Amino acid sequence: MTSPHFSSYDEGPLDVSMAATNLENQLHSAQKNLLFLQREHASTLKGLHSEIRRLQQHCTDLTYELTVKSSEQTGDGTSKSSELKKRCEELEAQLKVKENENAELLKELEQKNAMITVLENTIKEREKKYLEELKAKSHKLTLLSSELEQRASTIAYLTSQLHAAKKKLMSSSGTSDASPSGSPVLASYKPAPPKDKLPETPRRRMKKSLSAPLHPEFEEVYRFGAESRKLLLREPVDAMPDPTPFLLARESAEVHLIKERPLVIPPIASDRSGEQHSPAREKPHKAHVGVAHRIHHATPPQAQPEVKTLAVDQVNGGKVVRKHSGTDRTV
């Protein structure tokens, strides 16, 4: 075969024959390639058709199996659905019961909260009233404490005046040369509260333990009234001052006064000396009238026990009456 495109070439018969040969070879190879492609396409189509038929058969088998199984399990499915319905109904009933219980508990909680609110208000009112009562009682206690302090100072002053009057009576009687009025120390001595701390005694320890506060902000104050009722006050109050320092002299002053005073205080003259004898006159041992405090004297080994007398003598109509007591008391 010759192509019409090569009709224009007139170089020579060799070139034309070579071109024709090349074209024929190319055409032959193209035909072979096309035939190969056609065969491959046919084989591919054949394989696809066989695969489609296999899948169709498998699908048919699965459909048959599903139909058979569904027909067999129809009865079991109805029983299971009924059981599930019953179970659901039971759970719903339990849920309703729990909801009712929850509602009841909420109501009870509201009631409890209301009661708590009422009780809190009541407690606040009572606490306010109680605090007001405590303030009033604390004020009253403060007034009583100040009155007690005034009375203690008055007692100390009256005691000093009483002993001054007694010294004047003793000096005017002239019954003895060793009268204590002759001593300038006794004449100028007046009871005064001690500047230093008094020695610790069981009585002071008991007072301190009773007046000690149980809390830094509150202290317990027990007071018994005329009706023997115990009142408990819990409010910061000042402790009642101890009147003992106003009634007792210091130990250092006692030691100093012992050196200045005579060891024997003679009895005071009385109009009734002829009627009865005083134990102080009958016994020549060392006797001492306490001036609101204790003064201890050194006694000889053979001396009899001292007679302790009351701290304050009674002056009635210019006569001195001395009272004896078994114990030493302070005014």
From Swiss-Prot:
It is found in: Cytoplasm, Cytoskeleton, Microtubule organizing center, Centrosome, Centriole; Cytoplasm. Interferon-stimulated protein that plays a role in innate immunity. Strongly inhibits ebolavirus transcription and replication. Forms a complex with viral RNA-bound nucleocapsid NP and thereby prevents the transport of NP to the cell surface. Interacts with CEP164. Residues 18-44, 76-152 form a coiled coil. It comes from the Eukaryota. GO terms for molecular function: identical protein binding. It comes from Homo sapiens. Residues 171-212 are annotated as: Disordered. This is Coiled-coil domain-containing protein 92. One of its GO terms (biological process) is regulation of defense response to virus. The gene is CCDC92.
